[in-house]
């Protein structure tokens, strides 16, 4: 989210279900089966993720992250989260305290965070069956329905729902909005949260509120000329095209596709369709959700221009605008192509950008499951930035907004608009806090995919897959990336011949795959998928070994500035509380692993020994990621 203040047919029965409890709409639904069936199949998709609840994390750092976020989701007071909605829609706030930060009663785009909470609660319920999270989501939906039903008394048009007046949209359309609000950004979050409660909890009340609000968007935007709409799109609008395309896919009603396509931003899409990099100077996280929308619009329509936009955007961003940890942007903005070493600052790598790039990567993988580069990037960003985004010392799993890459950087940096260090229970509500809630409640969603009877293994972490469609259970056991080995045991109705495809990352060499201790004679070329086709027996154990080594990753714009990687892991230097005025000069030949039981290394920098460790664990101390290697 930018710190710049300058950037920023109706459905008739929209509020008719306000008296129906959302909790009632999920009674009898098991979390794994509550999701509604989409009305339309995605076009061009040849790999499919497993549903929430089919993959469970087991004891690991990743499960710890999930549990900390779950603690916060169970703790947070829904009455406080409802304060701005109730006040705006002229209902009693029931004596609740108001929030601070980006959800304060006078903050321009207050009420954006609540959609993230809805999504995260629904995900936790779908994954774990947590009824506290289910009930919080149900209560919020019921109260949002009451707010929406009171629009007549509040002076709003049918279907409208948010924490600020509808008049902000009139100002947006007139080009006079100057209070810092990004109103469609907020509407996107609310729509997405309601959609997820419908999909993952089976809540028909969430569906009705969702379609009421979507109907309002259709009415509001349908009155504008194409030129007026493109002017509206100059203000950040999140992933409106993505969520409306999702609603189209969910309902099969072409009205929502028509509405989605009104949010196709020509000034951004046209250059990308021609594979032109014009990202320099653009607010980064304003763009990435649009790219996700292009991918979803391709899957909804089959129009290859949308696919090209999404794919070109991914290639341009990852290859020319991405730091070694997988994040992008400095001060929330894209810089010139390949400008990496030139922008090693305290305000690099806004968390939202990386979260959304992971979403885009996942969508593109479903279209091209043979392209290993997609999940090589996914793993790099997921592990090095997003796992480390969360403060492991905080039982509520609070997060950093930026991940600093300056010499002697330290996690715990808030946004320019509001400042701070880590997010808090009630006084932050940044965009990155919201996406963090989503991130750390779905860490398991991209470990495995399926393509017909083929199982695809993309990520290596302790987990259990219940492939219920086939009666197969896959148990993955590993200490990766401390170890270079993972095992996958298949049990259940595994008989017959079928294929397991395993990602062989581009950074490895000499990878091996064995079954029940016997090395298999299959191709394990780095940057490919190894294909293991066999007649299976319950209990068969696949062992995957991916040898790791130190590789220096030079910055795109300066061959003498580089980061240290070991397998998928970025290694950073631990400088305690020492400040650094410049990049330390590293003796690259001195890098030595000092423990087989951890990723502990040492090296010589500026003539002194420095400890190195995995960047995702670099907490509570000043660190260094990029090094001066000009003396080597």
Feature locations, PLM:
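N-terminal secretory signal peptides and thylakoid transit peptides that target proteins
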Residues: 1-18
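Low-complexity, Ser/Thr/Pro/Gly-enriched N-terminal "stalk/linker" regions
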Residues: 19, 24-25, 35-113, 138-171, ...
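Long, well-ordered core segments of solenoidal/helical folds
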Residues: 65-97, 137-156, 208-225, 255-275, ...
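Carbohydrate-binding/catalytic loop surfaces
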Residues: 83-107, 158-181, 231-247, 274-296, ...
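Extended ligand-binding groove/face enriched in aromatic
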Residues: 99-103, 125-262
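Well-ordered alpha-helical segments within folded domains of soluble proteins
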Residues: 109-126, 182-198, 233-248, 282-299, ...
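Active-site neighborhood of glycoside hydrolase catalytic domains
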Residues: 237, 246-270, 287-325, 353-356, ...
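C-terminal beta-rich recognition modules with glycine/proline-rich loops and embedded aromatic residues
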Residues: 260, 310, 375-389, 394-489, ...
């Amino acid at each position: 989210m930018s710190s710049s203040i300058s950037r920023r047919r109706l459905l008739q029965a929209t509020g008719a279900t306000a008296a129906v409890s959302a909790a009632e709409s999920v009674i009898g639904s098991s979390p794994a089966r509550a999701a509604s069936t989409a009305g339309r199949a995605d076009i061009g998709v040849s790999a499919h993720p497993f549903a929430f609840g089919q993959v469970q994390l087991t004891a690991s750092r990743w499960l710890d992250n999930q549990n900390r976020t779950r603690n916060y989701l169970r703790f947070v007071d829904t009455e406080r989260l409802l304060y701005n909605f109730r006040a705006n829609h002229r209902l009693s706030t029931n004596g609740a305290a108001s929030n601070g930060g980006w959800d304060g009663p006078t903050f321009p785009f207050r009420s954006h965070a609540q959609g993230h909470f809805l999504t995260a609660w629904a995900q936790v319920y779908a994954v774990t069956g947590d009824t506290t999270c289910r009930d919080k989501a149900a209560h919020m939906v019921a109260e949002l329905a009451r707010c929406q039903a009171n629009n007549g008394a509040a002076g709003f048009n049918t279907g409208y729902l948010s924490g600020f007046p509808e008049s902000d949209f009139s100002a947006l359309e007139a080009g006079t909005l100057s209070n810092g609000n990004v109103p469609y950004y907020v509407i996107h979050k609310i729509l997405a949260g309601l959609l997820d409660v419908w999909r993952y909890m089976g809540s028909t009340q969430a569906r009705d509120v969702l379609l009421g609000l979507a109907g309002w968007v259709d009415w509001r935007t349908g009155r504008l000329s194409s030129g007026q709409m493109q002017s509206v799109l100059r203000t950040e609008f999140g992933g409106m095209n993505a969520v409306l395309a999702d609603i189209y896919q969910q309902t099969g009603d072409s009205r929502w596709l028509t509405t989605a396509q009104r949010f196709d931003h020509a000034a951004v899409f046209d250059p990308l369709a021609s594979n032109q990099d014009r990202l320099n100077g653009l607010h980064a996280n304003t763009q990435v959700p649009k790219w996700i929308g292009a991918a979803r619009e391709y899957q909804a329509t089959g129009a290859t221009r949308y696919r090209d936009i999404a794919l070109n955007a991914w290639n341009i961003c990852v290859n020319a605008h991405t730091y070694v940890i997988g994040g992008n942007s400095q001060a929330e903005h894209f810089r010139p192509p390949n400008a990496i070493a030139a922008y090693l600052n305290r305000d690099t790598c806004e968390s939202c950008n990386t979260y959304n790039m992971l979403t885009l990567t996942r969508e593109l993988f479903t279209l091209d499951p043979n392209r290993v580069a997609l999940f090589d990037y996914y793993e790099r960003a997921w592990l090095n930035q997003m796992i480390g985004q969360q403060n492991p010392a905080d039982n509520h799993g609070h997060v950093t907004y930026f991940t600093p890459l300056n010499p002697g950087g330290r996690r715990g940096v808030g946004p320019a608009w509001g400042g701070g260090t880590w997010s808090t229970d009630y006084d932050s509500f940044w965009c990155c806090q919201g996406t963090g809630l989503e991130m750390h409640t779905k860490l398991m969603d991209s470990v495995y995919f399926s393509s017909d009877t083929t199982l695809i293994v993309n990520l290596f972490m302790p987990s259990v897959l219940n492939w219920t469609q086939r009666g197969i259970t896959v148990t993955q056991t590993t200490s990766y990336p401390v170890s270079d080995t993972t095992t996958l045991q298949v049990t259940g109705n595994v008989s017959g011949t079928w294929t397991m495809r395993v990602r062989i990352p581009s950074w490895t060499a000499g990878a091996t795959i064995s079954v029940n201790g016997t090395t298999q004679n299959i191709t394990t070329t780095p940057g490919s998928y190894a294909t293991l086709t066999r007649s299976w027996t319950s209990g068969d154990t696949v062992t995957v070994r991916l040898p790791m080594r130190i590789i220096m990753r030079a910055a795109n714009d300066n061959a003498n500035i580089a980061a240290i990687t070991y397998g998928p892991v970025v290694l950073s230097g631990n400088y305690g509380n020492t400040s650094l005025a410049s990049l330390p000069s590293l003796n690259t030949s001195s890098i030595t692993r000092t423990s087989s039981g951890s990723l502990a290394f040492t090296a010589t920098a500026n003539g002194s020994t420095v400890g190195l460790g995995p960047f995702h664990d670099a907490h509570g101390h000043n660190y260094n990621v990029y090094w001066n290697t000009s003396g080597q």
